[in-house]
Amino acid sequence: MNLEILAQLTALAFIVVSGPLVIALLAFRKGNL
């Protein structure tokens, strides 16, 4: 497998996972306030 493709897939997966995670974290912190 090409290393460049693997890096792009890793970055894409990181964005897909971190997006909802950041939103959930913000909602959780707002709920606590």
From Swiss-Prot:
Keyword Ribosomal protein: no
BP-aspect Gene Ontology terms: photosynthesis
Recorded topology in the membrane: Single-pass membrane protein
Cell compartment(s), UniProt: Plastid, Chloroplast thylakoid membrane
GO CC terms: chloroplast thylakoid membrane; photosystem II
Chain segments annotated as transmembrane: 5-25
Pfam family of the protein (one): PSII_Ycf12
Keywords on record: Chloroplast, Membrane, Photosynthesis, Photosystem II, Plastid, Thylakoid, Transmembrane, Transmembrane helix
Primary localization class, coarse: plastid
Homology family: Belongs to the Psb30/Ycf12 family.
Binding partners and assembly: PSII is composed of 1 copy each of membrane proteins PsbA, PsbB, PsbC, PsbD, PsbE, PsbF, PsbH, PsbI, PsbJ, PsbK, PsbL, PsbM, PsbT, PsbX, PsbY, PsbZ, Psb30/Ycf12, peripheral proteins of the oxygen-evolving complex and a large number of cofactors. It forms dimeric complexes.
Role of this protein: A core subunit of photosystem II (PSII), probably helps stabilize the reaction center.
Protein name (database record): Photosystem II reaction center protein Psb30
Lineage: Eukaryota, Viridiplantae, Streptophyta, Coleochaetophyceae, Coleochaetales
